[in-house]
Amino acid sequence: MRTLGLDLGTKTLGVAVSDEFGWTAQGLETIAIDEERGHYGFERLRAIIDEYGVDTIVVGWPKNMNGTLGPRAEASERFAAKLREEFSLPVVLWDERLSTMAAERMLIAADVSRKKRRKVIDKMAAAVILQSYLDSKR
């Protein structure tokens, strides 16, 4: 079974999936969403969950640097509750502080153009979040 990693934004949802052993995370795709209208791409997520045999979902939880919860962390909590209800799978909120910055640094180091970075940053951030979670399980 595999673990799904998600990085929630207001307009996009970064998606990553673990390998079958739960050792590595791979960025999969970015799904266009509309958080204000409550459209979270659940149809596509269901297809991914079924295709990869996902048994756990990890959602990035963007705490403030001092550990407090701001509006984005609260949005992630609401999203996690919707995921639990929709998919009946365990959902883990995982501290994602600096994950997008780490993903950005990796892409810059790989000499990825700014235009291409914009297209892949969300799925890369999801992979960073998921890899952090997977590493904690070993």
From Swiss-Prot:
Which superkingdom heads the taxonomic lineage of this protein's source? Bacteria
Subcellular location as annotated: Cytoplasm
Pfam families named among the record's database cross-references: RuvX
Query: What is one cellular component GO term in this UniProt entry?
Result: cytosol
The protein's name: Putative pre-16S rRNA nuclease
What this protein is reported to do is described as: Could be a nuclease involved in processing of the 5'-end of pre-16S rRNA.
Q: SMART domains recorded for this chain?
A: YqgFc (SM00732)
The alphabetized list of GO BP terms reads: rRNA 5'-end processing
